Amino acid sequence: MLKVSARHAPVLRLPRRFYAQKTRVVIGPRLKNLDEIKEYLGKPTWSVEKYLQSSSNGETQPPSRETVEKLLKLSGLPNENVEMFQATLGKQLAFINKVQSLPVDESLDPSHARIIDRNSEALDYESLSCSVEQQETEKDSKMGEVGGSWDGTGLAAISENGFYVLREGLLKNRK
């Protein structure tokens, strides 16, 4: 059924099964009890400190002074403490090189690496308008929401059909 309202554009009302999507986020295998959770959290995989310590051994050279000065200029920072920035950037680059050289376990499912669904569909106007209409009709009484109870133009000096009326020009002595 097509409903035409003075406030909104025409909206096609469809049963929920036509536009509702069920999304479920799967991060990894489900842990069934407290012992499995403790076992999972008790297994250390790797330590950042281990790679930071090994990266400070001088395996990679820090960036040159000219490079650091150029980066400081691009970022708008003063050219003070260039040596400190040079050492810090050297440690960070060594750490990144270590992380990139780590062996990757190919048996792991790469879809578990993200929380957000990688295969999400584009949102179109119809599904957006239907979900807005659904939210308007399904107010939460626990939260004190009452459908149609708020009048956004109720305090306006001049309104017509639920819209504000704006006048152009100087508003001296006008009502």
UniProtKB/Swiss-Prot annotation:
It is an enzyme of class 6 (ligase). GO terms for biological process: glutaminyl-tRNAGln biosynthesis via transamidation; mitochondrial translation. It catalyses: L-glutamyl-tRNA(Gln) + L-glutamine + ATP + H2O = L-glutaminyl-tRNA(Gln) + L-glutamate + ADP + phosphate + H(+). It is a peripheral membrane protein. Its EC number is 6.3.5.-. Belongs to the GatF family. This is Glutamyl-tRNA(Gln) amidotransferase subunit F, mitochondrial. It comes from Lachancea thermotolerans (strain ATCC 56472 / CBS 6340 / NRRL Y-8284) (Yeast). The lineage of its organism: Eukaryota, Fungi, Dikarya, Ascomycota, Saccharomycotina.
